[in-house]
A protein has these predicted regions:
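Zinc-dependent deaminase
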Residues: 1-22, 83-154
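Generic structural signal for well-ordered alpha-helical scaffold segments
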Residues: 13-17, 60, 64-65
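Short, basic and Ser/Thr-rich N-terminal targeting/leader segments
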Residues: 23-27, 73
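Short beta-strand scaffold segments in enzyme catalytic cores
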Residues: 27-35
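A short, polar/charged loop-to-alpha-helix boundary motif
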Residues: 47-58
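Helix-adjacent hinge/juxtasegments
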Residues: 53, 61-94
Length: 154
């Protein structure tokens, strides 16, 4: 199973490099259902001026456009970075069952921040919380983030 996660995370890293090359934070995301990539997302909030163009949300939109709305609850979200609060809401709304990510984002992450949207059971309509696997290719994700911070004096 770890090899499978590594394969999809390598694809996310390639998407993150596309985001970085276009002036965006280096985030890439995939939605996978039954071994098939059903949605892809490249972070584009900065380049488009639309803050909702986070890689995870773009991947969900792409999966829906590809006809997979009813399968989202059975899909796995792969992403280079822990989903933020906004993306975590979308994940819970669509009941995506598993999330695999590289690096944590403790200030605004849906799993590690004090707002912990990904594990709350306080919203009954969200159902069961997703399984979360973190730290897959963390070092590579952190390097891309550092490259973005240096390029943008952050």
């Amino acid at each position: 199973m770890q090899k499978e996660h590594e394969n999809y995370m390598q694809q996310c890293l390639r998407l993150a490099k596309v985001a970085l090359a276009t002036g965006n934070p280096p985030v890439g995301a995939l939605l996978v259902y039954k071994g098939e990539v059903i949605g892809k997302g490249v972070e584009a909030g900065r380049s488009t001026g639309d803050v909702t163009n986070h890689a995870e949300i773009v991947a969900v939109r792409n999966a829906i456009d590809n006809g997979y709305l009813k399968q989202l609850h059975l899909a796995t979200m792969y992403t280079t970075h822990e989903p933020c609060l906004m993306c975590s809401y979308v994940i819970r709304h669509h009941k995506i069952s598993k999330i695999v990510y590289g690096t944590s984002v403790p200030l605004v992450g849906g799993a590690t921040s004090k707002f912990n949207i990904l594990s709350t059971q306080d919203v009954p309509k969200w159902g069961d919380k997703p399984t979360i696997i973190s730290g897959v290719y963390r070092a590579e994700c952190d390097l891309l983030s550092e490259e973005f911070r240096k390029a943008n004096n952050l």
